[in-house]
Amino acid sequence: MEAKNKKAVASRLCCLCNLRRPVLKRPKTLQQICRECFYEVFEEEIHQVIVQNRLFKSGERVAIGASGGKDSTVLAYVLSELNRRHNYGLDLFLLSIDEGITGYRDDSLETVKRNEVQYGLPLKIVSYKDLYGWTMDEIVKMIGLKNNCTFCGVFRRQALDRGAALLKVEKLVTGHNADDIAETVLLNILRGDIARLSRCTSITTGEDGPIPRCKPFKYTYEKEIVMYAYFKKLDYFSTECIYSPNAYRGFAREFIKDLERIRPRAILDIIKSGEDFRIATTTKMPEQGTCERCGYISSQKWCKACVLLEGLNRGLPKMGIGRPRGVNGDHNKETKKPGSVAKSIESKQCGSLDF
């Protein structure tokens, strides 16, 4: 009887330290662990991802894409801690994009401003209005809710690069987690997008562009990020974008979550499948050049952002929606060689913000 009681007590202890009571079951390992051990394994796994993939070099300036949400807030906190603990030697900055969404982004930016003080990281905010002459509120007013995520996604990606160029950083890190990457793999399969499928699982992208982007959370589950933020009592903004409930990605997200309930490792399995995909030798990949209008990296005469802006400014918001076909149907135009893309981004003008 006594042995049975001891076994019962042991089963209620953390499976790693056998000292404290567990507070959660890890989604990808199903281990029941205590809070202290969770902090340790969570941070150590991210450190190992950084080291094994050689994401940074000592002395580099690194911008953290900060939205105020759970992912970027936890990323900023953990990267700051690891930078000090393991002496990465990085100069870290927060980079936020103001899309101009009243009642959403203005509130989340207040969270980022608090994070700036809490973590002691300099903050740079770049707005769509300054870059493109439009806010997302104005764009949605013109085009409606359909396709608004296309505009925002294109503009946001370029805005992050332009903000990073202003900060003169060598790397840009984002809080994309394992769930996000699994969703992207699934979406690219459903769309038949071979080009994007070939690179969406890469932990570092854009190495041929102005500023490489890294994803330290590539193998980190969203659930664990939420739990880490909760236990650490981190200050983050949890409201969903008011324009995104009907986004196509949302359906993929729900499907992934259903799979995870049945098989917890489904997320990592999907990422592994994406990594194992190989591009057929007959598939011709578009050659990267630079946009004639703004100098941003592009495989067409004009980059996607400039095509979308041209449509907005001409009252033709559907221009540029869908697969890239070049400007005015001229998709076979010869593109400029990349050369010094970073220099082009800083020296060309986009909207009213001069780079």
UniProtKB/Swiss-Prot annotation:
- Classify the source by domain of life: Eukaryota
Quote the EC number.
2.7.7.-
Give the record's pathway: tRNA modification; 5-methoxycarbonylmethyl-2-thiouridine-tRNA biosynthesis
* Location within or outside the cell: Cytoplasm
**UniProt key word tRNA processing:** yes
Which residue windows does the record flag with biased composition (Basic and acidic residues)? 328-337
The segment annotated Disordered runs over: 320-341
Q: Name one Pfam family in it.
A: zn-ribbon_14
* NCBIfam families registered for this protein in UniProt: TIGR00269 family protein (TIGR00269)
Q: What is this protein called?
A: Cytoplasmic tRNA 2-thiolation protein 1
